Structures are given as structure tokens and as C-alpha cells.
Amino acid sequence: MDPSIFKLLEEDEDESMHSGADVDAFQAALNRDIEGSMTTSIPHVTNPGNNHSSRQQFSTWKNGIGDSNINVQTQHSLESTQMKEQEGSTLENQHQHDLKRANEPHLQHNQPQDLHRAGQLWENPSQVPQSTGLPISEKNPTGNESDRSHNQESESQYMKLQKMSSQQARGVEPPVNPMNVNPINRNPKQVPFAALLPTLMNQLDKDRALQLRTLYARLKKNEIPKEGFTRHMKDIVGDQMLRMAVSKLQQVNYNQGKIGIQAPSTEINNQKSQSDPRAVHLNQLPSSASGTLGSSVPVQGLTKHPQHQMQHPPSSFPMYTTSGSFHSFPGPNTNASGSTLRPHLHDSHMRHVAHNQPMGSTGLGGPPQSTTNMMTMPKFERPSSVNDPSRVQGGATSHFQNSSSLPLNSAPGQGSSVSHVKQESVDQSFEKNNAASMTSNEDLEKESSRMVLSTPNNMAPASSVSPSMTTQLDASTTMNSRGPLGTSQGGANARMPPKKPSVGQKKPLETLGSSPPPPSKKQKVAGNSMDQSIEQLNDVTAVSGVNLREEEEQLFSGAKEDGRVSEASRRVVHEEEERLILQKNPLQRKLAEIMAKAGLKQISNDVERCLSLCVEERMRGLLSHIIRLSKQRVDAEKSRHRTFITSDIRLQINEMNQKVKEEWEKKQAEAEKLKKPSESEEGDGGVDSEKDKEDNRSKGVKGNKEDDDKMRTTAANVAARAAVGGDDAFLKWQLMAEARQKSVSEAGKDGNQKTTSGGGKNSKDRQDGGRRFSGTESSCGVGIVYRVSSSRFWFAMMSFGFLFAGGRRVGKNQGSSLQPKVVRTISVKDVVAVLEREPQMSKSTLMYRLIQ
């Protein structure tokens, strides 16, 4: 890495920490020392002519409290450091300035020499400090008698003003001002890491900014050396961006160093601004560059939370002006609790004639300059009530008066002005209720580091200076003169339009030395803006063709119609509510009885309606449960549970068997009757009887075969019909019985004929054949009832099985079709079943009455 960049990034850091108890103890001791030193040393400085004694008193007092100043600075630096770490990397610049304050003890001992040499820093830019603050005590072996005499006079004026400031400040409050000293670098070319870090953060994305912030935290904890931090930062940021940021900071610090030389305050306050945030401090500082007075009234005006009050030195917004420069330094914001503090400065103590010195004639080459010394105050106005004039006024308290004009450095058209400074009485009262969120600490910090109003090369006359105070001014921004250079006229009043550093609000112009504006001005402006916005809105509606009156009428008419509809619906609901399930008179009588028993005197009208609705809801629930349980109840007396008989197979079989038996008995009786006459005729023809027997046998066999075939065919047809779903089984059995009767009658006829022609043996054979036929007949007709050892039994079983199955199916279908729909009824059994399942009714007397 380039060694020049490395040198630019070097800085000295003080990481020393102190506990809170040590700081408080030191604070108390410091307060006692300050009170004693101020009472003993300051009253002696009363004679402006006694330069030697005042010089000794000043140096003695400065040396006595020098160490205390350093400790106070360290204390506030530590407080600022803690708050900076919470706020983030954007406030690192101020944090580093506060830390380096303890490293410059030698700047606070040789104060008169520094004040004397502050005017020479304009001619030597290499000795200009890099940050606005205390002048650097550079070693300068050369000097002249005029400078010394000027130094003595400025010292006497300085001590005189200190005495006056201390007397008035004690009436207000012991101020806290730990030496308004900004940290400076030992080498003007060096750039601190803390000042460089916010500039780089704004140009990086989130990831790289986070990496850089983490790297800086490690550097603060001494985890990595400065060389390693520089190397890693170059890797993250890049060489080109780093060079640009460093050059920009150098330019900014150079400009601020040229115009920001100021004398430190010599008062050390006995209380911190944290303990009493309602203080108004008066610090009057000499301007040593031109010999004129630059007085500042620090205003602590903007209320912040206590944790935000450690970020700045206790003196807030003093503006120190030397060689025509304007510089502001922010401090913690406090709130004066409604009290108006008015430090009145006498005019005789504030009027001094500036010593004009031809700086170009001393041989120190430099640009021609026109110095204008001003006493200004930043102006921060808070919103207040209409009749409340309690607002902080500042900024317009400088009155410029030129008593002479001398050319500087033999440059025509340029001159120096003699300033006459008069500080007007300023009302500094704040309302705590009106001090909410006006500015942020970032705004105040930016204002302290970026508010530059003019440069030595381009100076305007006092009458043409019009700086603007905003929080967005860059550090390198300067105010160029708007008119030609020239000498200012005596008694000319410079107009300064300071603006409030709050975002989005502007302040009206004010003339220096004028009285504060009326408090109702802002409200008037706000009212005018509101009226203007309403008028603009009306204009927009008119241009767009919207008639507001018609729209309003439509809206109101729609509301009326809605009201009518809602009224009708309310009326209907009311009528429905009036139709209660319980009658009013019986209900009122019952309620009266209950009230008499319970000892009630009065009952509301809504009770009747509520009871009626409750009864209705209870009955609805009971009925739904009763209907559900009635479907599950099974009663024998119900008609829907009765069975309808469509066909009785057993009865039909018994009837058929009975008929067969009767027929068989008749045949037997007829056969016996015929047997008796045949026995008498047996002896007549033996050969004929044998032939007849054989013929009868052959005919009987043939007849039986035919009958069997017929029966098989009919049974098969009946079974097929039953399988398909044909006629009733009763008809089928009837057909089969008729067929059997026919076959039996035919067989009987044939047998009778044979018996009449045949002998006694033929009659026995016919009897056997009749028995055999009757047996087969009964087996075919009865089936399951009679078991016959025959090959046709299994076929009959199969056929009858089909018949039985078909009969069952037909019977079921007929039963379902003939079954009527039963009308459901609710009986006491259903009510009892429902109440038994309810816990609150299962053991009530109503259950016993229902069961009985």
C-alpha cells in the first residue's frame, strides 16, 4: 500500500475509561476548585492598563485548572463515546474528536500566545488545523513589538469580559463548559479513521458497510493493528474510492481550518448539562486575529432525551467569528422549564474599537482579505401557543459599525471594517411541552461540522452578508459575496436570515437587533396554508366537473332511504317479537306468583319476552329429540310390524296328500267288491287267464312310462317358469295335481277293464300295481314329505327347491309392495325416553308422573 495513504489514515486514540463514581467525585472537587479560583483570581483583573499583572493572573489560573480541564474533557469524551456506539457509525466523526481532546494538554497552557498567532495562520496554509476548533500552538520564533502590545491589550479585554461573564453567569447557573476544543491532528495531512469512516459508509452498500463497521470495532478493541485495518479497508473499499474520500476530507478540513480558528472558553462550569438540562450559558470569547470582540451566547434549546445529551460538549451552538468567519459548535440540548433567563450585557463592556493591522505589510505573503467580525447566535425557534412569547431568539444580535477603512496588502477596492458589537437582551425561555422532536443529534452534528459561511478570499461587506443556516450544508460550501468589494458604511445593519435546523420548516427573515416576531405569526401562516389547501381542493373538484352540492344531497337522500328501510325492518322485527308463544295474561299471573314466593317487588318487561323465547327454544329442542327417538321405538301393536302370508306350502302339501289317500281308499273298496264275483268264476278258463296277465303287465309298464314322462316334462316346465319368475306356486301345484288325477283315473279305468276280463291273479297284480303307482304318485306329489326309494326322488327335490325359492321371493316382493306407509305418532314413551337422557330431568317429579 502507498505509504502516503497510510500516513494520512494514522491517528492517535485514547481508550482510557473512567467509572461513574470517579467522575462524580472529581466533579464535586472540580466545582469547589472553580468557585475558589474564580473568586480569588478574576476580581484582580480590573485594570485594562495593567497588562503584566493580568497576564500573570491569567497564566496562573490557566495552569491551576489545566489538569481539571483535561479530566472534564475526558469525562465528556467518554460519555460521548458511549452514546456514539449506540447511535452507529454515522456519529463516529464526533466520537473521535471527543476522544482526542485529552491528547492535547499543551494547547491549554500557552493561550495568549496562541491567540496572538491565530491571525497569522491565514498567511500560512500549511499550519491551518484540519478541524474547526481550538487554534494550534505552533512554534513561531519571530515576533514584533506591535504584536506583543496588541496581545497585551487583547488579554486585558479578554479577562475583563471573563469577569463580566462570570458575574452574570452565576446569577443564572454555574455553567459547564469543558473547553470548547475540537480535536485536531498533529499533522495537517493526517485524516482520522473516525472522520473517514462515515464518508466511506455513505458510498458503500449494506454488506460492505457492515464489514467495514465490524473491522473498525475490532480496531477499537485493539484486536488488529492499524496497518492491518488499513489493508483490510483498502480491500473492502478499493484504492480509488479511498483516495477520493481522503482528498475530500483534506479539502474540507483545510477550508474549516482557515475559517474556523477560535479562542477556547476559559470558564469551567460546576455542573454537567446532564444533571441540570435547563441552563443558558454565556461564553464571551475574544477575537485575537483582528483585535475585535466576537461574543457568543450559547443557547441550549432543543430538548432531547437524557441519553442523547452526552454526545456534544455542554456549550451549545456558540458561534465564534474571527477574520470574517462564522462557525457554530453544537452542544447538548436542554429545556428551560418555562422560565425566562435574560442576561443583560451592558453596552460599555461590549463596545471596543478594533485594532486594524495591515497584515500584508509584515512581509507574510497572503491573499488580500477583508475581515469582518460578527457576534451571532444560532436561532432555534420552537412552536408555542398563540399568546406565548417564550421562544428562543438569536442570530440577529450583531450590530456592525465601521469607524475606519484601511487598505490591506496594498490591494485597491478592498478594506477592513471596524466592528462595533452590541449584544441585545435575548429572551431565552422554553416550554417543555412544546419541545418535542424538533431536531435530531445528526442534524446538530452536521451543523457543527458543515456550517461555513465565508472564506478569506471572498468577503462581502457587512451590509451584504446573508448566510443561511441549514443542516444540509457541506463542509466545503462557502458563502460568496453578492456585491462588489468595498468599505462598509458606518452604522450599516447586516441582515442575517438564519434558518431553523429542523427538516421541512423555514424561518422568516429578521433584521439584526430587531424585536422577536409575534408568536401568532406561525399560526397565521399555518391557517393561511390550510385555507389555501382547501381552496385548491375546491378548485380541483370544480375543474373535474364534480358538483359538491349535488353530491351532498345524494348522500343525504341515500341516508334517508336507508333510514326508512331500516325503520321498516325494525317494525317487522318488533311485530315478530310481539307474537310470543306464551300468552301474556297467564304468563303474567304465573310470574306474579313466583315473585310473591321469591319476595321480588318489581320485574322488567323484557322478562316476559325472554321467558317466552326460552320456552319456544326449549320446546323446539324437545320435539326434535322426541321425533328422532320415535323412529327407533319398536311396538308390537303397530301395523307395520305385522306379517302378511301370501302362500302356505305346508298346507297345500297336506291337502294334496289327504286327497290321494281318499282316492286310494275308494279304489280299494271297489276292488274288494269286484273280487268276490270273480272268485266264483276262476275255475272256468285257466289258459286265458295267463295270457291276460301277460298283456296286462305289458300295458301297465307302458302306461307307467308315459305317466313318468309327462310328470317330468311338467315338472321341468314349472321349475323353469319359477326360475324366470312366473305364476304363483299355488297354481303350479294345482296343475300338477290335475295331471296326476287324470293319469290315475285313466290307469284305474284300464285296470278295471283288465280285472273284469282277467282272473283272481290279475286282481292281485293290479293291487300291487296300484300300490306301486300310488307310491310313486305320492312321492312325486309330496316330494320332501315322503321318502321313496326311487331314481326320480332327486329330480323332484331339485324341482321343489326351485319352487320354494321362487315362492319365497314372490312372497317378499308382494309383502313389500303391499305394506302401507305408517303415519308416525309420538307417544308418552318417546317423551319419557327423551327426558330420561337429560341429567336435569332424569330424577324430576315429572318423570314419575309420566311413568305412572
UniProtKB/Swiss-Prot annotation:
Cellular compartments per GO CC: transcription factor TFIID complex
Ranges where the RST domain occurs? 184-255
Please note every region of biased composition (Basic and acidic residues): 662-679, 688-712, 742-752, 762-771
Expressed, tissue-wise, as follows: Expressed in roots, leaves and inflorescences.
Q: Where in or outside the cell?
A: Nucleus
- Ranges for the region named Disordered are 41-100, 124-166, 284-315, 354-528, 662-712, 742-777
Please indicate which superkingdom the organism of origin belongs to: Eukaryota
Has UniProt tagged this entry with the keyword Transcription? yes
Is Transcription a UniProt keyword of this protein? Answer: yes
Q: Could you list this entry's UniProt keywords, alphabetically sorted.
A: Activator, Nucleus, Transcription, Transcription regulation
Q: Which GO terms describe its molecular function?
A: protein heterodimerization activity
List, in alphabetical order, the GO biological process terms annotated in this UniProt record. DNA-templated transcription initiation; transcription by RNA polymerase II
Biased composition annotated in UniProt, kind: Polar residues? 41-81, 124-144, 154-166, 284-298, 384-441, 451-491
Assembly notes: Component of the TFIID complex. TFIID is composed of TATA binding protein (TBP) and a number of TBP-associated factors (TAFs) whose MWs range from 14-217 kDa. Can homodimerize. Interacts with TAF5, TAF8, TAF9, TAF10, TAF12, TAF12B, TAF13 TAF14, TAF14B, TAF15 and TAF15B.
Q: Which family does it belong to?
A: Belongs to the TAF4 family.
**Function recorded in the entry:** TAFs are components of the transcription factor IID (TFIID) complex that is essential for mediating regulation of RNA polymerase transcription.
- PANTHER family from the entry? TRANSCRIPTION INITIATION FACTOR TFIID SUBUNIT 4 (PTHR15138:SF14)
What is this protein's name?
Answer: Transcription initiation factor TFIID subunit 4b
